[in-house]
Amino acid sequence: MDVNPTLLFLKVPAQNAISTTFPYTGDPPYSHGTGTGYTMDTVNRTHQYSEKGKWTTNTETGAPQLNPIDGPLPEDNEPSGYAQTDCVLEAMAFLEESHPGIFENSCLETMEVVQQTRVDKLTQGRQTYDWTLNRNQPAATALANTIEVFRSNGLTANESGRLIDFLKDVMESMDKEGMEITTHFQRKRRVRDNMTKKMVTQRTIGKKKQRLNKRSYLIRALTLNTMTKDAERGKLKRRAIATPGMQIRGFVYFVETLARSICEKLEQSGLPVGGNEKKAKLANVVRKMMTNSQDTELSFTITGDNTKWNENQNPRMFLAMITYITRNQPEWFRNVLSIAPIMFSNKMARLGKGYMFESKSMKLRTQIPAEMLANIDLKYFNESTRKRIEKIRPLLIDGTASLSPGMMMGMFNMLSTVLGVSILNLGQKRYTRTTYWWDGLQSSDDFALIVNAPNHEGIQAGVDRFYRTCKLVGINMSKKKSYINRTGTFEFTSFFYRYGFVANFSMELPSFGVSGINESADMSIGVTVIKNNMINNDLGPATAQMALQLFIKDYRYTYRCHRGDTQIQTRRSFELKKLWEQTRSKAGLLVSDGGPNLYNIRNLHIPEVCLKWELMDEDYQGRLCNPLNPFVSHKEIESVNNAVVMPAHGPAKSMEYDAVATTHSWIPKRNRSILNTSQRGILEDEQMYQKCCNLFEKFFPSSSYRRPVGISSMVEAMVSRARIDARIDFESGRIKKEEFAEIMKICSTIEEFRRQK
């Protein structure tokens, strides 16, 4: 049917229609090819913003480094990274003066975290640069490889399982004269297959030892691998993001813990909270400014945008901040926290896979690895690439580029927010000593600035002063991209404020639809998304009902499970029709078995199996919820599962949904082809970890499982737990004397094995 789109907006206030202009429907753009070009751009831009700084050479790695700190004061509006140490320290001091005890308390909280955090904290997160293999790996594998190499090089503090002890090993590894690592490689040989008598290629995975000297090891330890950021909407150009290795991660985690603790205590900070909590926090700041600007004052709000936030931040500045924040704390704590910014001042950016290179005349495609860019003849490249390579050449060492200034995306979100808030905090009248004053909101690089003054000149003066103050700490407010409005209408982190936050529903659009996990989870996630949007995002009843019908339709097409009495023919219809005819109570069939949909907006909170349980035929119940059903490999059953949903911006969110395990909760098997690649050893390691962890959890059900304190290993903990449980079971008569004796014997055997090993 034809709809004139303007009709949709006749009754809608303009600010509510804003969300229709967002680029959120359809698939987001993904990048292809290597990120080498984007990374070079980042490195070159970062150096350009700091070009008037001082050049030095790192004595350990020989890397040239640019230090813009306390560089020339800006004379124009170009973005620059010349932060002034004394200005940053003054902002910190005033932040503390206006929030007495904030740094002290946050340090105490962080110290407690530092002493308790286990090394497995580092297994969270997705792809991580694995310095032993010089490429990306899942975080858990990268950590395991690092620990394995550390131990074989005599670094054993990590065996306590505490993150802080692992970090002691990292520090020690940097003082060693060299490190021996194990790398994986593939051997191919042609052999004759006994069965078919044909020649086949046989691949075997070899491990070989390799020695890295001190310089090579340090370069790897300080390396951030780079990739292209995928799925960014509303942009034409892609950009590079970084993933640090295990040596850096632990230190960054502690710094961010401290900064997070500070952000929680600052009313202007948009981190670390999110969603409705964030909206409430921000609405408070706006309310304060509007209430205080009585009839005599004007109040304006800038929807702010900063130019290249990360590339103008500087790790040396963060070091100054940390030194100030922790100034009355014990020496060991100050040292642990200062290592992350020091490592970042000496970081190296890995240029990724290299350049794809095609020659039209010779019909040739080849990839030039990043390592070769330092000395390849530039006549093969086009003009723009040539410029890029020429600029970056002086910085190259072993295929990585020395990148001292700048921060790389997403590394110190919390700490950079603290810096931003400290400038917003300088807007109080008792500090500015003028008729104007300001306040605002900060969330990583996004900000909103609210300026109050008796007249327009005052507003202009306030904005100018804010702009200049920012420049002094390496923050560059973009005059082109920021815009000013009467307070009451602004945008901050894609929340639109119009006398209260209006729901920006289009941001949730990508999470509607069928997820593709399995029939059971998809149904549950689909209705939960609709339910959550009715609660949080002004999804009205009529629209929700329509969304539900569209979802069911989508679901049936995805899994080819149209109702048993439909005319639609698919490859499943024969079986589903048969089931439909055999079933007495047809309303009891799940939608995925060709049943009718019983969901409406009043019962979205009930899992489908529960909704239909009373309506099901008895034999259908027996087949559906049968743990012995051979066609289903069951996970351990939890009542709540976590799905990853993709909102339109920000990282993928985890969303809880009710999980009722049925024969529809299947788990697809791993693709076999990985088993023939060099990844195979890694896969086996992963499975071994999985088995150990599962076994451990069997001994310590989550209710009683507190992280082990002290140095007992997993095995010791399990053995002692088994003994205690056996004794309790024996004394209460749950097990016989013989069984008790057998358990004790097994425990002793295990301990004996450990001693021999």
Curated annotation (Swiss-Prot):
Annotated RdRp catalytic domain residues: 286-483
EC number: 2.7.7.48
GO molecular function: nucleotide binding; RNA binding; RNA-directed RNA polymerase activity
Keywords per UniProt: Eukaryotic host gene expression shutoff by virus, Eukaryotic host transcription shutoff by virus, Host cytoplasm, Host gene expression shutoff by virus, Host nucleus, Host-virus interaction, Inhibition of host RNA polymerase II by virus, Nucleotide-binding, Nucleotidyltransferase, Phosphoprotein, RNA-directed RNA polymerase, Transferase, Viral RNA replication, Viral transcription
Modified how: Phosphorylated by host PRKCA.
Motif (Nuclear localization signal): 187-195, 203-216
Region (Disordered): 50-82
Cellular localisation: Host nucleus; Host cytoplasm
Catalysis: reaction(s): RNA(n) + a ribonucleoside 5'-triphosphate = RNA(n+1) + diphosphate
Extent of Polar residues compositional bias: 55-64
InterPro entries the record matches: RNA-dir_pol_NSvirus, RNA_pol_PB1_influenza
Region spans: Promoter-binding site: 249-256
GO cellular component terms, semicolon-separated: host cell cytoplasm; host cell nucleus
Enzyme kind, highest EC tier: transferase
PROSITE patterns attached to this UniProt entry: RDRP_SSRNA_NEG_SEG (PS50525)
UniProt record, GO biological process: DNA-templated transcription; symbiont-mediated suppression of host gene expression; symbiont-mediated suppression of host mRNA transcription via inhibition of RNA polymerase II activity; viral RNA genome replication; viral transcription
Task performed by this protein: RNA-dependent RNA polymerase which is responsible for replication and transcription of virus RNA segments. The transcription of viral mRNAs occurs by a unique mechanism called cap-snatching. 5' methylated caps of cellular mRNAs are cleaved after 10-13 nucleotides by PA. In turn, these short capped RNAs are used as primers by PB1 for transcription of viral mRNAs. During virus replication, PB1 initiates RNA synthesis and copy vRNA into complementary RNA (cRNA) which in turn serves as a template for the production of more vRNAs.
Subunit note: Influenza RNA polymerase is composed of three subunits: PB1, PB2 and PA. Interacts (via N-terminus) with PA (via C-terminus). Interacts (via C-terminus) with PB2 (via N-terminus); this interaction is essential for transcription initiation.
Protein family: Belongs to the influenza viruses polymerase PB1 family.
Protein name, per record: RNA-directed RNA polymerase catalytic subunit
Gene behind this protein: PB1
